[in-house]
Amino acid sequence: MTATLLQLGPVAGERPAQAIVDGLGLGLAEGVVNGRPRVAAAMIASADGRATVSGTSVGLGHPADRALLRELRTAVDAILVGTGTLRAEGYAHLLDDDQRERRIARGLDPEPIVATIARRGDVPVEVPLFREPGARIQVYTEAEPPPVDGCAAEVMVHRFAAGGATPAAVLAHLAAERGVRSVLCEGGPTLLRALVAGACVDDVLLTLAPLFAAGDGPAVLEGAPLDPPRRLRLSDLHRAGDHLFLHYAAAT
């Protein structure tokens, strides 16, 4: 039997980052499904599957990738990110003035909530985002956190019992207590794996960088093998230069 493949590109026509993200409908999500918001996971990888180069994702990126990320942030109610990623990437300004104004016009707060899970109480208050007066940060922990009173950002700490600060519990809390309908997870690899393992990811936005990285850096997902592996359904594909931008939906 001869296998056949469908050629997807190159395809004529260009779409701006805003139009691509608008097509996902993240900003139109209403209510919650199975007690949690709709979750989109944004990730970037080298051609050999590494999520970082020299400790961060910066060396893998492309201007179009960064534009897509900011548009995704513009669309959602909240961002979920691990403390390690907050530190490594030095989170600061999330959006520009135009994106904030577009959120306000849609009846949203100027910037999305940023939620992070710090089970051991290691809240990264040194990250520039904690010094942003307009930032709203939700911290979920299972230990005694450091003081956050000196942060310019609005920081709320939620302490769970041991083993309770799971991604699923955090998503449920964001939906029930903060009215969050859509979440963008920006990693890192351990958090992404936990979300996938818990069937808490609806959309995957994967940027594939035209690089071989090798080394011992993390893969896009890190942790124990998923048994069985989780299947995805390709929904869309875009290209900028030699970078590929793939949108997958979780298979049902």
Model-derived features with residue positions:
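Enzymes that bind and transform nitrogen-containing heteroaromatic metabolites
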Residues: M1-T252
